[in-house]
Amino acid sequence: GRDEKCCIVFASEPKNLVGLVDKIAPFPPGHYYKDGVFVRYADMTRVERPVYDDLDTICQNIREKLIAGVEKRLIADAKVGFLLSGGLDSSLVCAIAAKKSPKPIRTFAIGMDTDAIDLKYAREVAEYIGSDHTEVIISRDDVIEALEPVVALLGTYDITTIRASIGMYLVCKAIHEQTDIRVLLTGEISDELFGYKYTDFAPSAQEFQHEAEKRIRELHMYDVLRADRCISVNSLE
């Protein structure tokens, strides 16, 4: 935003700008600011060229890139842990890491003390890949107590983001307090890339592409915001 002297003001969190500027707007991802304008230097949604390979070739390409990405991030100066929900994203990341690691990886899951279906699926994956698995059990009171600090750290009132962030915040808090792990790997973005349930109802391939691009373009306001804030506020990377 701009202050009363029309100077642009930046901060790492919106709440730091309250009272300094009249209007607060996010710094657009993939941009830098120079001479009064935002200049785009990268666009994750840009399609360089359409791909017409067969499905097997495309899947193999994705597989190779995912494996290389996980393997690269296993190189860290601090101990690495893994968030495991039992869903597609985190299960794939953990399975790849388990294969590439010389010893069992440490995985963490969180769930309520009643009807914890995510814990069940995470446990099945952990047993299959042979990880050193930890379950963090939370109660209704834990969730309610976490609500206010989670809203404060996110700087958003988006219901879905807040709801998804409570569990992540609490599991990261437990990891920081109870272990010496300081780097976390987690699975994100496969739903946005490949369409959520919207894929089933998209009227055309072009409309599906448009929706996928929109979800990727807005990631910094939702899933990336959740992961970044919940992890960093607990002194993790």
Model-derived regions: residue spans:
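N-terminal segments that mediate ammonia production and transfer
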Residues: 1-56
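ATP-dependent adenylate-handling active sites, centered on carboxylate activation for C-N bond formation
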Residues: 1-4, 47-237
